[in-house]
C-alpha cells in the first residue's frame, strides 16, 4: 500500500476521535464551559464544598436510615474545570494534526484560518443544541494565561541583531503609526456617526477614539501564524513582527487612557498631560522591569551547576513574574516579558546545560503553540451567539477606514524614515508591510473588555471588530502568499551561516566601527562596540560563571584531543614534536610505502568509522527548533577535519602510484614478459640501512600515516615532505635476525599462500601497535563492518637475489 493508502488509514481513526471529542463537548452541560472561562470562581466554590457524609442519602432511603457503600459513583463537578480544559487542549492539538495530514492545505490556507473555522463549527453545534450563546473567552484568561507564552516564545527566539539594527524603524511604525491609525480611524468614524441617516449619533468622540485605538492593534499572534509560512526576508519579517509586538503596548496604553476619559465627567488639561506622561512611563517601566528580572534570572542560574533539573524552571518563572509584575503596576506586560526574554536568551543560555536548553526550547514552543491554537478556536466559538448588533454603515466604514489609514500611514511614514536608513525600504516592502496589518486576539479581547454600562453600543463594536478580524485573517492572510510570489519579494535565506562567514562579519563590524571612530560619527556600530566592551568587562563577569557548559560535540572532540595527547606522551612522541623554528633541521627521509590494497583498506576504515557526523534536517518554522550556533560550528569543524583527512589520504595514494610507476620494478605492458628496461629508465635509489650500508632499491613500501594531519598539512611546500619520525606510523625496514644482510648464495624462499615470498630470519615489526594506532576502544568498531582481508605480503628488496624475477615474472598484476 502506497503513502496515500497509509494516510487514508490514519485519517479514518482521527476523524472518529474528533467526532467523539465533539460529542463530549456537546454533552457537557450548557453552563459548564461558561463557568470555566467566565465564572471560574463560582464553579470552584460549588465544587470545592462537597456535601458532608451525613448529608449524603442513598436513593430510596430516608435521612434516618444508614447509607451503604456504593459500587459506582459519578462526581463530575469535582473535576469539571480540569477535565474540560484537558478536552479543549486535546481537541485543539488533534485538529492541528488533522490539518497537516493534508500537506497542501496549510500552504493554501493559514493555520489560523483553519482553527477559527473549527471554532465556528463548535460554536454552531453548541448554539444549536443549547439554543443559547456559546461561552465567550474571558479577557483575564487571555491576558494572564494565553498571551504570555506566545510573547515569551517570540521574544526569546527573536534574532536580536536585525531587531536592534531596525529598532528605530520599528519604534517609528509602532508608536507614530499606531497614533496615526487610532486618531485617523476615530475621527473618521466620528464623522460618519454625525450623519443622522445611519442612526449612530449616540456614539461620542471619545468612544470612537477608544474603538479606533483597539481596532488599530496589529496582532502578533496573527502575524506570526501567517508570516511563518511565506518566508519573507529577515528584514521585512522583523519590521512587521516588531511593529506588531510593540504597538500592542501602545494600543493598551491608548485604550486605558481613552477608557478613563470616557468614565470622567469633565476632562482637564492636567489629565491630558498626565495621559501623555503615562504613555512613556508604561512603556519604559515595562522594559526596565523585564531587563531587571532577566539579570536576576541570569545571576540565579550562575549557581545551578549542581542542580541541573531546575534550570528550565527559572526561565519560565522569571519571565512570567516580569509580566504579572508589570501588570500589577499597570505597566506594559508585553514589553516587560519581551525584554526579559531577550535578556535571558543572551545570558541564561550560557549558564544552563545543553539538555536544559533543549528542554527550554521544546517546552516554550509547546506552550506557545497550544496557546495560539486555543485563542483562535475560542475566537470562532465566541463569534456565534446573540451578542451582536449589525449596522451596515458602521461595519463597512470601519473596515474601509482600517485599510485606508493603514496604507496611508505606512507609505507616509516610510518616506520620512527612509531619509535616515542606510538601506531604504522599497515599494514592494512597503506594500507587504501595509498588507500585513492583521488584526487578531488583542483586538478581540479588548472589545469584549468594554463595560456595557459606559458603552451602550458595545454589541455594535463587537460585531465591527469581528468583521475586521475575519477579513484581515482570512482574505489578507490567504492572499498574501501568492501576492509575495507575484511581486517577487526577496525571500529569506535558509542557508546556515558558516564559521568563516561569522568571522568575516565580525571583522567587517570592527572595520566599520573604526571608520566611524575616525570620521567622528557615532552610529550603531560605535554604540554596539561600546556595549560589547562594557558587557565583557562587567556584565558577563557578574552574570555568567567561568566554566560554562559546552556542546556535547565540542566536549567529545576535546576528550579525543586529550586522549591523543596522552597517547603521544606515553609513547615518547611528544618530545620530538617539530616546531616552526626546527623546520629547517628536518631531514628528508625516504620510507617504504604501503601496497594499494593496504591503502584501500585504511581509506575504507577511515571513511566508515572516523568522525561519524550525525546529520540533522534543517527547516524554518516557528514551532520547530532552530539549529544551535555552537552545534553548527562544531559540526563544521569535524566535517572539515574529516574532509582534510580523506584528501590527504587520497593525495598520498596518488603519490604512491606515481612513484611505483617510475621505479625499475614496474611492469610495462608494452614490453615482452621477461624483457628488462633500458638503463635510462632504471632509476636506482640509494637507501641507508641501520649499519650504514647502502643498496639499490625501489620505492615500493609502507605508507606514512600522519597521526596529526593538521601539523603536516599546513606546512610550507619546501617542508611538506619533511617530518619527524615520531609523527610517522610506518613499517620498519627488514631487520635481519641472523646478520645484517643475507648472503648472495641464499636460494629464493618459497612463496606463501598470499602470493608473496617469505624470508627466513627476516621480521617486519610495526613501530606502533594496533592499540596505539587506533585506540583500544576503537578496535572492535574498526573491524566490525569491514570484511577480513589477507595480511600484506612480505616482499624482498629488489637487490636481493631471486627476488627481481619473482616480482617481474611470477607476481600477479
From Swiss-Prot:
Membrane topology: Multi-pass membrane protein
Activity regulation information from UniProt: Li(+) activates Na(+)/H(+) exchanger.
Gene3D superfamilies: 6.10.140.1330, 6.10.250.1040, 6.10.250.2020
Keyword Transmembrane: yes
One GO CC term on file: plasma membrane
The reaction(s) this protein catalyses: Na(+)(in) + H(+)(out) = Na(+)(out) + H(+)(in)
InterPro entries per UniProt: Cation/H_exchanger_CPA1 (IPR018422), Cation/H_exchanger_TM (IPR006153), NaH_exchanger (IPR004709), NHE-2/4 (IPR001953), NHE_CaM-bd (IPR032103)
Subunit structure: Interacts with CHP1 and CHP2.
Sequence similarity: Belongs to the monovalent cation:proton antiporter 1 (CPA1) transporter (TC 2.A.36) family.
Full protein name: Sodium/hydrogen exchanger 2
Annotated source species: Rattus norvegicus (Rat)
Amino acid at each position: 500500500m502506497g503513502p496515500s493508502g497509509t494516510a487514508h488509514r490514519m485519517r479514518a481513526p482521527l476523524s472518529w476521535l474528533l467526532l467523539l471529542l465533539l460529542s463530549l463537548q456537546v454533552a457537557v452541560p450548557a453552563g459548564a464551559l461558561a463557568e470555566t472561562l467566565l465564572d471560574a470562581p463560582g464553579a470552584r466554590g460549588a465544587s470545592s464544598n462537597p456535601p458532608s457524609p451525613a448529608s449524603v442519602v442513598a436513593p430510596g432511603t430516608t435521612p434516618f436510615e444508614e447509607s451503604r457503600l456504593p459500587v459506582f459513583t459519578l462526581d463530575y463537578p469535582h473535576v469539571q474545570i480540569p477535565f474540560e480544559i484537558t478536552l479543549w487542549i486535546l481537541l485543539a492539538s488533534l485538529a492541528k494534526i488533522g490539518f497537516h495530514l493534508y500537506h497542501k492545505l496549510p500552504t493554501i490556507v493559514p493555520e489560523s484560518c483553519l482553527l477559527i473555522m473549527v471554532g465556528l463549527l463548535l460554536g454552531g453545534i453548541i448554539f444549536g443544541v443549547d439554543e443559547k450563546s456559546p461561552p465567550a473567552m474571558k479577557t483575564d484568561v487571555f491576558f494572564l494565561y494565553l498571551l504570555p507564552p506566545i510573547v515569551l516564545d517570540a521574544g526569546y527566539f527573536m534574532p536580536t541583531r536585525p531587531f536592534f539594527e531596525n529598532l528605530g524603524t520599528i519604534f517609528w511604525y509602532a508608536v507614530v503609526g499606531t497614533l496615526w491609525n487610532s486618531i485617523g480611524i476615530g475621527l473618521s468614524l466620528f464623522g460618519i456617526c454625525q450623519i443622522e441617516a445611519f442612526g449612530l449619533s449616540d456614539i461620542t468622540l471619545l468612544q470612537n477614539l477608544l474603538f479606533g485605538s483597539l481596532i488599530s492593534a496589529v496582532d502578533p499572534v496573527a502575524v506570526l501564524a501567517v508570516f511563518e509560512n511565506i518566508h519573507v526576508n529577515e528584514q521585512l519579517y522583523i519590521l512587521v513582527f516588531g511593529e506588531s509586538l510593540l504597538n500592542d503596548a501602545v494600543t493598551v496604553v491608548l485604550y486605558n487612557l481613552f477608557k478613563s476619559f470616557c468614565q470622567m465627567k469633565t476632562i482637564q488639561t492636567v489629565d491630558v498631560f498626565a495621559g501623555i506622561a503615562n504613555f512613556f512611563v508604561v512603556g519604559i517601566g515595562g522594559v526596565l522591569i523585564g531587563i531587571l528580572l532577566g539579570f536576576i534570572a541570569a545571576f540565579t542560574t550562575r549557581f545551578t551547576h549542581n542542580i541541573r533539573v531546575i534550570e528550565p524552571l527559572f526561565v519560565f518563572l522569571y519571565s512570567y513574574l516580569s509580566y504579572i509584575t508589570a501588570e500589577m503596576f499597570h505597566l506594559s506586560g508585553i514589553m516587560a516579558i519581551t525584554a526579559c526574554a531577550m535578556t535571558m536568551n543572551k545570558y541564561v543560555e550560557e549558564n544552563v546545560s545543553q539538555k536544559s536548553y533543549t528542554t527550554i526550547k521544546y517546552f516554550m514552543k509547546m506552550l506557545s503553540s497550544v496557546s495560539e491554537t486555543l485563542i483562535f478556536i475560542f475566537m470562532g466559538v465566541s463569534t456565534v451567539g446573540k451578542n451582536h448588533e449589525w449596522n451596515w454603515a458602521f461595519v463597512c466604514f470601519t473596515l474601509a477606514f482600517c485599510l485606508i489609514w493603514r496604507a496611508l500611514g505606512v507609505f507616509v511614514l516610510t518616506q520620512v524614515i527612509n531619509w535616515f536608513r542606510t538601506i531604504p525600504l522599497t515599494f514592494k516592502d512597503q506594500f507587504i508591510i501595509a498588507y500585513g496589518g492583521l488584526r487578531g486576539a488583542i483586538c478581540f479581547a479588548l472589545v469584549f473588555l468594554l463595560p456595557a454600562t459606559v458603552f451602550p453600543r458595545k454589541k455594535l463594536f463587537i460585531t465591527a471588530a469581528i468583521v475586521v478580524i475575519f477579513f484581515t485573517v482570512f482574505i489578507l492572510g490567504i492572499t498574501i502568499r501568492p501576492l509575495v510570489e507575484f511581486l517577487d519579494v526577496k525571500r529569506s535565506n535558509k542557508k546556515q551561516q558558516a564559521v568563516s562567514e561569522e568571522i568575516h562579519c565580525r571583522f567587517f563590524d570592527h572595520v566599520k566601527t573604526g571608520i566611524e571612530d575616525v570620521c567622528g560619527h557615532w552610529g550603531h556600530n560605535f554604540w554596539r562596540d561600546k556595549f560589547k566592551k562594557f558587557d565583557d568587562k562587567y556584565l558577563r563577569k557578574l552574570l555568567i560563571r567561568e566554566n560554562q557548559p559546552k556542546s556535547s560535540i565540542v566536549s567529545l572532540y576535546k576528550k579525543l584531543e586529550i586522549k591523543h595527547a596522552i597517547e603521544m606522551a606515553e609513547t615518547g612522541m611528544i618530545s620530538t614534536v617539530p616546531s616552526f623554528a626546527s623546520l629547517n633541521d628536518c631531514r628528508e627521509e625516504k620510507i617504504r610505502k604501503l601496497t594499494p590494497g593496504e591503502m584501500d583498506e585504511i581509506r575504507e576504515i577511515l571513511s566508515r568509522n572516523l568522525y561519524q557526523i550525525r546529520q540533522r534536517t534543517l527547516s524554518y518554522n516557528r514551532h520547530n527548533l532552530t539549529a544551535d550556533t555552537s552545534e553548527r560550528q562544531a559540526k563544521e569543524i569535524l566535517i572539515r577535519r574529516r574532509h582534510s583527512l580523506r584528501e590527504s589520504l587520497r593525495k598520498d595514494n596518488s603519490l604512491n602510484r606515481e612513484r611505483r610507476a617510475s621505479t625499475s620494478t614496474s611492469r610495462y605492458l608494452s614490453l615482452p614478459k621477461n624483457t628488462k628496461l633500458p638503463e635510462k629508465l632504471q632509476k636506482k635509489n640509494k637507501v641507508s640501512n641501520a649499519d650504514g650500508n647502502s643498496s639499490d632499491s625501489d620505492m615500493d613500501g609502507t605508507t606514512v600515516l600522519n597521526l596529526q594531519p593538521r601539523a603536516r598539512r599546513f606546512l610550507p611546500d619546501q617542508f611538506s615532505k619533511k617530518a619527524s619520525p615520531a609523527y610517522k606510523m610506518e613499517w620498519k625496514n627488514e631487520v635481519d635476525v641472523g646478520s645484517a644482510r643475507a648472503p648472495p648464495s641464499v636460494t629464493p624462499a618459497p612463496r606463501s599462500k598470499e602470493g608473496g615470498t617469505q624470508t627466513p630470519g627476516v621480521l617486519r615489526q610495526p613501530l606502533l601497535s594496533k592499540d596505539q594506532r587506533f585506540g583500544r576502544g576503537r578496535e572492535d568498531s574498526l573491524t566490525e563492518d569491514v570484511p577480513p582481508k589477507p595480511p600484506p605480503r612480505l616482499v624482498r628488496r629488489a637487490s636481493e637475489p631471486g627476488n627481481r624475477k619473482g616480482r617481474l615474472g611470477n607476481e600477479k598484476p
